[in-house]
């Protein structure tokens, strides 16, 4: 049977149809009502995926079953609605008896009842009593007025008896020195008799009973009386607790304060008791915990700051380098090569062309009497140069031995003749080169004052420099020419003996890497000069040389 995901997936458009065709018990009422048969039939007829004939038959079976279910549900709903309509609308049948066809009047009518509320007599309200509820007694809202015999110091004062002596402005000089003033007429005895005016009952300041004497002393301009021993030796008692009863001082019988009414004292005592507050329990107040000092912890910077990032973006040190140009002339190039400390301390002042003379010169530095600061470095450089020269000489000797094995004694004569000729040519060239070097050194000492003058003269004397430059290059080229000629002569001798092919591997047998490289280079130079022809079968295979057109003409 042909199945597709359109039929088997739970959310597919034909999933319910497929379920109805194969598993009708799984269909619910919601599935039946949600299914739109018109759309599903169109999808079956014009589906995007080709459906097999048997599969389409199963789908049509599912459509028929869903349609049957819908028809059953519709029929059941219609029957239920018809039954309810028949039960509700019954012509001529009423559930109530005939007597109760109409409702009673009292059952459908609310009673009208007017309640009689008790009204109060307005005239019976005592307005005066209502307003006197918030009135207080005159004694409670009126200050007590105490009048004494002397009205001099009480005039204009309002309960400030204790502050009189503390104010300097009250005893101005114009009042004390005025002859017409009332203070002049008073005597010391009269002032002493007025102690109750200044005396505050045991205020604890130590001046009890001495207020009048203080004023008398001030009027008499005697300042030392206050420091008498009689006043200092008096015992002053601390103020006792205020008793409930009125205290009458025995020393001051004149100053007695009596309340006008007993009720006023009672109200005052009640007010004092009412306004005194109980002490607060300290244990109830929670002590504030002392906050611990927090240490200032600063995180290390783990990100690249904007300044560093901008600096990295704008720096071109990695991509840009200083332009190092070669010297413009060959003489300056030679000075740069030979101007180092190693070459100056290991070679002579003049350029010695012969290898034996250089060897003799370097042997002088190997003596025990040579003591400088950089002795070890110089010895190492000298040893390296000596070793390199010895390697060159040993390679030449090994080549000569190899040629001796292959060739006859005639090749030795050719080599000796060639070396003699080259030595004569070297001597002639060295004479000219020594003269050029002397001129170069003398001109270099004169031109060391300024670089611009050197460059100008170097451009003018370009032809002279070409003649005197490159003695070392000439030596190297002569060495390579000698080796190439030796290789060519050995190949000629082998060809005369009947060999038509020359193998590079056989020639390089029992040779080190440097000798093999020299022989390979000689083969390449001979190939360039068309003296031999080279061939190789495979990469990294043996190189075979054959006779070329210029083999005997060079």
Curated annotation (Swiss-Prot):
GO MF term set: chromatin binding
Domain of life: Eukaryota
Keywords: Chromosome, Chromosome partition, Meiosis, Nucleus
Chief site of localization: nucleus
UniProt KW Isomerase keyword: no
GO biological process: chromosome segregation; meiotic cell cycle; replication-born double-strand break repair via sister chromatid exchange; sister chromatid cohesion
A GO-annotated cellular component: meiotic cohesin complex
InterPro entries: NXP1_M-like, Rad21/Rec8-like, Rad21/Rec8_C_eu, Rad21_Rec8_N, ScpA-like_C, WH_DNA-bd_sf
CDD domains from the UniProt entry: Rad21_Rec8_M_NXP1-like (cd21792)
Membrane spanning residue stretches: none
Keyword Nucleus attributed: yes
Subcellular location: Nucleus; Chromosome
Subunit organization: Component of some meiotic cohesin complex composed of the SMC1 (SMC1A or SMC1B) and SMC3 heterodimer attached via their hinge domain, RAD21L which link them, and STAG3.
Family according to the record: Belongs to the rad21 family.
Function: Meiosis-specific component of some cohesin complex required during the initial steps of prophase I in male meiosis. Probably required during early meiosis in males for separation of sister chromatids and homologous chromosomes. Replaces RAD21 in premeiotic S phase (during early stages of prophase I), while RAD21 reappears in later stages of prophase I. Involved in synaptonemal complex assembly, synapsis initiation and crossover recombination between homologous chromosomes during prophase I.
Annotated protein name in UniProt: Double-strand-break repair protein rad21-like protein 1
Organism: Ailuropoda melanoleuca
Recorded name of the encoding gene: RAD21L1
